[in-house]
């Protein structure tokens, strides 16, 4: 059975800052939600279901925040799903929300993902031993630095590839008034001059800890017909594998290769390098 068409008809984003002390978690989410609904020309009463995305609870120090957020999210008396896939939660939340429309379960779905890490201690949260998992004792940067070095060695990428990406992203962020960082004049040279944190990752290559939220309104084909400029979802794919399996290729995981192949097939793409103009990772 093929997926039913689904489209994004409303988007909303908050200002991202180190500390959003002007709003609570609920207020932060509603800020993004209200903007998405306004963009879609809808009200909460018209929404069939809500999907909320949130990374580990320890990042804010609130367990299962979707429970106390239900009313603020407009989910009282409606289906509410919480998505949590750690660092990929942003993309996973959008996939789950769109699947509810593509499967014909709902016609109008509101999805919101947020972080408010200023209310907790991210370093402490990342230091808690996870049961039944291999201890790393290195933090996120120390964990991924060897992967970056391996990628550079295996792919033949320049050793300063991270600085190239960082300079590009910082420049693009200047076009988004809601972005956390607005660092004008960031260049490859300025990134390379910043402090080394985990070889080969430098300070200016890393992201800040932010408070912020984003929201989407995803609807069925018949509802999208009333929208002036719907953004159609041409493909959604999710693949998984054991993170710490001894045979797993950490640099080029099988799950990533399988997901990419399935996505190109869904979207009718035969040459990604020629046909894809913009790419974003979560």
PLM region spans:
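N-terminal beta1-alpha1-beta2 module of alpha/beta enzyme domains
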Residues: 10-55
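Conserved small/polar residues in nucleotide/adenosyl-binding loops
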Residues: 280-282
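Short, well-ordered amphipathic alpha-helical segments that serve as non-catalytic structural scaffolds
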Residues: 26-41, 65, 93, 144-148, ...
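Buried hydrophobic positions in well-ordered alpha/beta secondary-structure cores of metabolic enzymes
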Residues: 9, 36, 47-50, 97, ...
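Active-site-proximal alpha-helical scaffold in enzymes
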Residues: 85-115, 141-175, 216-222
């Amino acid at each position: 059975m093929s997926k039913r068409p689904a489209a994004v008809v409303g988007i909303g984003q908050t200002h991202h800052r180190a500390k959003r002390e002007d709003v609570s978690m609920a207020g932060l989410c509603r800020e993004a939600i209200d903007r998405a609904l306004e963009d879609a020309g809808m009200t909460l009463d018209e929404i069939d279901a809500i999907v909320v995305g949130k990374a580990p609870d320890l990042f804010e120090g609130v367990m299962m925040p979707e429970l106390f957020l239900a009313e603020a999210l407009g989910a009282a008396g409606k289906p509410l799903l919480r998505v949590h896939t750690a660092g990929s939660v942003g993309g996973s939340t959008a996939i789950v929300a769109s699947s509810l429309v593509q499967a014909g379960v709902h016609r109008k779905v509101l999805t919101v993902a947020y972080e408010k890490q200023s209310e907790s201690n991210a370093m402490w949260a990342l230091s808690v031993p996870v049961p039944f998992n291999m201890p790393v004792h290195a933090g996120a940067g120390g964990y991924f630095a060897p992967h970056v070095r391996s990628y550079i060695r295996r792919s033949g990428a320049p050793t300063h590839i991270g600085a190239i990406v960082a300079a590009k992203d910082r420049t693009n962020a200047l076009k988004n008034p809601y972005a956390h960082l607005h660092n004008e004049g960031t260049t490859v040279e300025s990134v390379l001059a910043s402090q080394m944190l985990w070889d080969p990752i430098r300070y200016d290559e890393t992201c800040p800890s932010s408070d912020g939220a984003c929201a989407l309104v995803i609807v069925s084909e018949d509802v999208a017909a009333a929208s002036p400029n719907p953004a159609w979802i041409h493909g959604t794919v999710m693949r998984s594998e054991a993170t710490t399996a001894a045979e797993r290729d950490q640099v080029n995981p099988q799950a990533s290769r399988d997901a990419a192949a399935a996505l190109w097939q869904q979207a009718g793409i035969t040459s990604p390098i020629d046909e894809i103009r913009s790419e974003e990772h979560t």
